[in-house]
Amino acid sequence: MKIIGINGSPRKKSNTRFLLEKALGECGKSGAKTKIYDAMKVLDDQEVPFCEHCSSPCNSSCYEGKKLEKMFEELKQSDAIILASPVYFGTVSAQLKAIWDMSRAVRTEHALVGKIGAAISVGASTYGGQETTIRALHDMLLVQGMTIVGNGLKGIDVGHHGVAAREEVFEYEPAIEDAKNIGKRVLDSVCHS
């Protein structure tokens, strides 16, 4: 079982990455192989770090032999994907959006259809756009044909759309628990799909 996380935060010590690590840590406890891709690093060898819609259908030549191609290959082989983004003006980071925009060839192949997807979002304040960002993350997953799960767990809490936290999360137990719960939910959904 393989579960991939994509960290959309451009920051080095990122609240978003921290919660993604917590979620994937829960998956790893049960033996799942996990990996995090940082959007900034994935895009750093791209000549043009966004989709120019240079071909239709997408021939993926813009990322051939690049880090993005490797990441897309791993996504295709994964059982689940957790997208995580900080809030930027009520939506996902430009880096994460750029990566997903360049996934047109993956979509054409139907490579992610039926895979489990989940979302994590961190904003600067309690009502800082986390839910609209999660909605955007869900839309990104749905356009690929993925099955979305929230952070609810049987017998604990029915949960919500995903993990919606505010900075600083490093010692904020409710956010950490939500992240762990979404990891458990992703794992449970993969095992029972």
Question: What are these model-predicted stretches?
Answer:
Residues 94, 108-157:
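Short, glycine-/small-residue-rich phosphate/pyrophosphate-handling segment
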Residues 1-109, 154-193:
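N-terminal beta1-alpha1-beta2 submodule of the flavodoxin-like/Rossmannoid cofactor-binding fold
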